[in-house]
Regions:
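Acidic, metal/ion-coordinating pockets
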Residues: 1-326
Length: 326
């Protein structure tokens, strides 16, 4: 990605998906790379890959209406605490909110607040990947949690959601970098954890990590995106595989723009626009590819009990107020 900055405008990589992103009130993304010029890579524990983005890449985020990012993932400390601090400094300068990592455990667990024209959104972020990145009382790192039935993280979610509501948040998002790569279906304990998060006050669970999209679900009026897959990702070309870890049948180049329509802060419709992430630039899927992406999502989500309808732009799920009482 950084190589493009000297040859292409920041808008180029988003292709014909850019108007969709700009048409939203705000875009939330998982930022799985530090933004830094620091060259000291993480050596405390073994890592195969160390990611880093040129500071000029912030322009790519800003032009796509990305207003808030999750930093809770297994790459944000690839260039140590210096890289994390640089990232936070660049995001702050660009006016992009962030959650999920910080100078200590309190900062890493702190929510991001996003003020839109009509409402306030609170964003929580956490990860169960790369335990060696875990923050401490005076240790920079991520908001590392255990995804389990009786995880202490559920208390943090309930407490944080209640505090955000008191501070005026109408919508609460929990962004989770969780689970293994290339898995098409969430494990049972992940589903139980997502349900528990909704029951503790979260409106939208935003999952990511697998590099392929997974099912979507509506639970008690809340939206669960178990994994949103890849979007802008140049890791696939590391060994010229043409696909991450050479699993082309997984189609890590298939994805969606996930749009949640809100009413008084509550989800009322989930819209999914099929996208192909390779070759660059990003583009809305058409023809056979669009149909294949849509069918996979329908198949993956069928077991979760909510019918997905075809819409002009892709797929959609309607969410009624009555769903909140189920």
């Amino acid at each position: 990605v950084s190589e493009l900055l000297g040859t292409m405008p920041p808008e180029w990589i988003w292709g014909d998906v850019l108007p969709v992103l700009r048409g939203a009130d705000a875009v939330l993304a998982n930022l799985e790379s530090p933004i830094t010029s620091h060259r000291g890579a993480w050596r405390t524990s073994w890592k195969m890959f160390h990611f880093r983005a040129d500071p000029a890449a912030v322009a790519m985020l800003r032009c796509a209406n990305i207003r808030v990012v999750s930093l809770a993932n297994n790459h944000i400390l690839d260039f140590n605490a210096e890289g994390l601090r640089d990232t936070i400094r660049h995001l702050d300068a660009a006016g992009i909110a962030h959650a999920g990592a910080g100078d200590d455990s309190a900062a890493a667990a702190a929510p991001a607040a996003l003020r839109l024209s009509s409402l306030q959104v609170g964003v929580l972020a956490a990860t169960d990947t790369m335990s060696s990145f875990r923050s401490g009382a005076a240790v920079p790192g991520t908001n590392y949690i255990a995804v389990e039935h009786e995880s202490p993280a559920l208390e943090w979610i309930a407490r944080s959601a209640a505090a955000l509501r008191r501070d005026g948040a109408a919508t609460i998002v929990l962004s989770l970098h969780w689970g293994p790569n290339m898995r098409l279906r969430p494990r049972a304990r992940f589903r139980a954890f997502a349900h528990a998060a909704i029951e503790r006050g979260v409106d939208i669970v935003h999952g990511h990590s697998a590099h392929v999209f997974q099912a979507v679900e509506v639970h008690r009026g809340g939206v669960i995106l178990y994994d949103t897959g890849n979007f802008i990702d140049d890791h696939w070309n590391f060994w010229n595989f043409g696909s991450y870890w050479n699993f082309p049948f997984r189609h890590d180049d298939w994805s969606f723009v996930f749009l949640v329509d809100l009413e008084a802060g509550r989800p009322r419709r989930l819209r999914m626009i099929p996208v192909q992430t390779r070759p660059w630039p990003l583009r809305r899927a058409t023809g056979a590819a669009c149909e294949a992406i849509a069918r996979r999502m329908e198949k993956l989500s069928a077991a979760f009990g909510r019918p997905i309808t075809r819409a002009e732009e892709g797929l959609a799920i309607a969410i009624a107020a009555a769903d909140e009482r189920r």
